[in-house]
Design a protein with these regions (language model features):
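Polybasic, lysine-enriched low-complexity intrinsically disordered terminal tails
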Residues: 1-21
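Short loop/turn microsegments at loop-to-beta-strand junctions
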Residues: 57-59, 70, 207, 367-370
Length: 410
């Protein structure tokens, strides 16, 4: 957890890499994409100011429109305590953004006819608790409407990367609500089961790491993305450091324990992937383009549309509601698609900002990683931050940066 005094790298050295990266994307090329150069410069300056003010430690960011990148930079520190600067190709633990990869592979199984949204989870994992077997479907898992137990740490730390051990621990667990009647974000339980479904349906009996690599990361050219901390990426890993002392349902110490879970051979389909800002941009671009990128089709447009359309009606997200009510904030609708978060109508605390269109969708990880796509304005935004923040603080910082990014759209 962050207790060290501020370290500083000269502003000129913090800026040098982003300036070099963006030099070829200024002027006419940015204007062709319908982006405001001056506003992108303001956004860049705001991120530098945040880091210099010690609001967080560093950030890697991409702003693009029509697939053309207008801003691509890394600012600040990968590890402030070690005075290690953040580089554009540094590899982040993206935590719950990993769920989006699991979602896409589940959707691809549905397209192949091997699974359905209405499939009962117990038909594939029969050792589940009887009530779960009878009532919970794949749709419930994807929409966080299963009534699932929170189960943040169902096994000892050294076993969190062992999916077999996790599944054995969560299968007997009881539901805490009637499936389909409420929304409560499931940090672990739901996507652990989805990952196990992927494994059990794989005829080649591959590891989950290999399935993700062969079916998603490889085809999309996401060369610096992996489930688990691949050995060749280890020198570029950005450590998980808690900038805030409390994270609601977790302490700062528990947040930093994630560094222990995500090992080279870990299989953690709810939070165990690592990636770079550019690789995550490629994934988001695939979604923006209706499931295809560079001639490689991962999903059909129909699946992307369904996944990024609100499936939870007006229900609030109970997982965050109490936290918001304590701060005097009225909880908004959950606005969850097939796990993807949708911006929705109205004004309020929102990581996607209040300037994005209502159909904007994305995925976010604990304390500072995420992406969103505005399909109406054809914008893709990725922001990965070092120095993780508590949920409401994180949302406020993300909202500010997202609104500044949208202000660059002409």
């Amino acid at each position: 957890m962050k207790k060290t005094p501020k370290s500083r790298v000269q502003s000129s050295s913090l800026r040098s890499e982003s300036q070099a990266r963006n030099a070829s994307r200024t002027g006419k090329s940015i204007k062709k994409a319908g982006l405001n150069v001056d506003q992108l410069n303001r956004l860049s300056a705001a991120i530098h100011q945040d880091v210099e003010a010690d609001l967080y430690d560093g950030a890697a960011c991409i702003v693009a429109r029509h697939g053309m990148i207008g801003l691509h930079e890394a600012v600040g520190f990968a590890n402030r305590a070690a005075n290690r600067p953040l580089h554009i190709d540094d590899v982040f633990n993206i935590l719950s953004v990993s769920k989006a990869f699991t979602d896409v592979i589940v959707l691809s199984l549905i397209e192949r006819g091997e699974l359905a949204l209405t499939t009962r989870v117990g038909d594939i994992i029969p050792e589940l608790n009887a009530r779960v077997k009878e009532a919970v479907t794949v749709f419930n898992l994807l929409t966080h409407t299963a009534g699932s137990p929170q189960a943040l740490f169902p096994v000892a730390a050294e076993l969190m990367g062992n999916l077999d051990a996790v599944i054995k621990a969560i299968c007997p667990m009881e539901l805490i609500a009637v499936p389909g009647q409420s929304v409560s974000y499931s940090p672990l339980w739901g996507h652990a089961l989805l990952g196990e479904i992927i494994r059990r349906l794989d005829r080649a009996q591959r590891t989950l790491r290999d399935i993700f690599q062969n079916e998603l990361f490889g085809p999309l050219g996401m060369k610096d993305t992996a489930m688990g901390r691949r050995k060749d990426l280890s020198s570029r890993i950005v450590p998980i450091v808690a900038h805030d002392l409390s994270f609601g349902n977790m302490s700062a110490k528990e947040v930093e324990e994630h560094n222990r879970y995500i090992t080279e051979d870990a299989e953690i389909p709810w939070m165990g992937c690592v990636s770079t800002v550019y690789d995550l941009f490629r994934f988001a671009e695939m979604l923006r383009r209706g499931g295809e990128l560079d001639g490689v089709r991962i999903l059909s447009p129909a699946s992307v549309k369904q996944a990024t359309t609100v499936q939870t009606g007006a229900l609030a997200n109970d997982y965050y509601a109490l936290m918001m009510e304590k701060q005097g904030i009225k909880p908004p609708p959950a606005n969850i698609g097939l796990d993807f978060q949708i911006r929705g109508e109205g004004v309020g605390p929102n990581a996607m900002g209040n300037l994005t269109s209502p159909g904007t969708y994305g995925k976010f990880g604990l304390g500072g990683t995420g992406f969103w796509v505005d399909p109406e304005r054809d914008v893709t935004f990725v922001f990965l931050r070092s120095g993780l923040l508590e949920h409401l603080n994180d949302t406020a910082r993300y909202q500010r940066i997202s609104d500044m990014a949208m202000a660059a759209i002409l």
